[in-house]
Amino acid sequence: MRAHDIGALALLAVLAVAGCREGQAVELPPLPGSAVSLDSLGQGVVDGFVRGDTARLRGYVLSLDEYRDVWPRLQIDTTAGFGFDWSWRDNRLRGERAFRRYLAGFHEMSLTAVETRCTGDPHRFEGVTVLPGCTITVRDSSGATEEMRLFKSVVVIGGGHKIFRYDD
């Protein structure tokens, strides 16, 4: 075999492998602190606020590095001047305000998450799915249930579930 034949075979092999990947979903590993399911995320959030477990609650929110990795995958139009820095600051400010309010309001209440649902159409991106329209149905000690919106959207990466921020 001549050198250019070997090069051509190598190129064909690379193209064949690349062709096998085309159209397949990118599978990323779950992020640290992710919940294994939507219901476990809702239960973890409710339990965290009731118990005042700030480390657990903060672990469910995308960190700066995670947000930095997810942001470009979302294909957000930044031509209006609302780029990554603005989005990160806005999420942190609004999320922290809601976090403090829920932490004070739910501490030591007798609440159990019954169901967590996201009713919006899923948005799929490279290795990331965003589930909008999320609510948690909670039950109190009297048996009464209420639907709450502690976060609006869930980010699913590698089967793990996290949130952008707590919503007010």
Predicted stretch roles:
Residues 1, 62, 159:
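Residue-level marker of positions within ordered structural domains that often coincide
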Residues 1-18:
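Sec-dependent bacterial lipoprotein signal peptides
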Residues 16, 53-54, 150:
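Generic detector of short, well-ordered, non-transmembrane alpha-helical segments enriched
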Residues 20-55, 59, 63, 67-69:
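Short, low-complexity N-terminal intrinsically disordered segments enriched in polar/charged residues
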Residues 21-26, 122-168:
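Short beta-strand edge/turn micro-motifs at domain boundaries
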Residues 51, 66-67, 74, 93, ...:
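Extracytoplasmic/cell-surface-exposed regions of Actinobacterial cell-envelope-associated
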Residues 69-70, 166:
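Short linear functional motifs in flexible/disordered or boundary regions
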Residues 72-147:
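Surface-exposed, charged secondary-structure patches
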